[in-house]
Regions:
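Glycine-rich phosphate/diphosphate-binding loop of Rossmann-like nucleotide-binding domains
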Residues: 54-66, 148-186
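Short, Lys/Arg-enriched N-terminal segments with co-localized hydrophobic residues
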Residues: 1-9
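Residues at the C-termini of beta-strands that transition into short coil/loop
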Residues: 16, 129, 185
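Phosphate/diphosphate ligand-binding glycine-rich loop within oxidoreductases
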Residues: 42-146
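Positively charged, low-complexity intrinsically disordered leader regions
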Residues: 9-62
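Short secondary-structure transition/capping segments
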Residues: 21-23, 33, 119-133, 151-156, ...
């Protein structure tokens, strides 16, 4: 039996469907979890995370699986190439995965595939990275800024390509309306 719609957190495809208040709540919760890990050590007890990697990443794998374990849950990891997703019927695979787990995190090559997941999941879905967005990286960066400077009200300079990180930074700072983002891109 799945939770009622209003009890399911929003899918984290990017920041478009999140308000500044919702993003701030996520950051506040993350800060509290870091400060009081014992308070959350059973928060996800009995919950199962499915991690799917089309794009490899040691850091993404370890951060999600360690986090899930520290919160009392379990995880199942799969590489895209070792899954039935490669057979070309992703919607039926998405539905099957949703019947067996409580949350999905996928690091995928194309944003279109992330959107396909977002349109078809019945459990919360987190975009671990795609060619257009990298929301989890930006949340981690924002948390570090808050820890080091006390707030997001900083001048932030991004130097690099206009890529998924840049897109998510622009989206995040536009939502939060705190601080100033400067970008030097080729």
């Amino acid at each position: 039996c799945r939770k009622k719609e209003e009890d399911i957190m929003k899918n984290m495809l990017n920041f478009k469907n999140f308000s500044a208040e919702e993003l701030q709540k996520i950051l506040d919760l993350a800060l509290d979890m870091k400060k009081n890990p014992e308070k959350y050590s059973h928060a996800l007890e009995g919950k199962k995370l499915y991690t799917l990697f089309e794009k490899t990443s040691t850091r993404t794998f370890l951060s999600f699986t360690t986090g899930m374990t520290e919160l009392g849950g379990t995880y199942y990891n799969q590489l895209w190439k070792d899954s039935n997703f490669v057979l070309g019927e992703p919607v039926s695979e998405i539905k099957y995965v949703c019947r067996n787990v409580d949350i999905i995190m996928a690091r995928l090559v194309k944003n279109e595939t992330v959107e396909l997941f977002g349109d078809n999941v019945t459990v919360p879905f987190i975009n671990g990275c795609d060619n257009s967005y990298h929301p989890c990286q930006i949340l981690a960066d924002a948390l570090t800024i808050i820890e080091k400077f006390g707030s997001l009200n900083v001048k932030f300079l991004y130097i690099g390509a206009k890529n998924n990180v840049f897109n998510s930074l622009v989206e995040f700072f536009s939502k939060m309306k705190q601080g100033t983002l400067y970008g030097l891109t080729p």
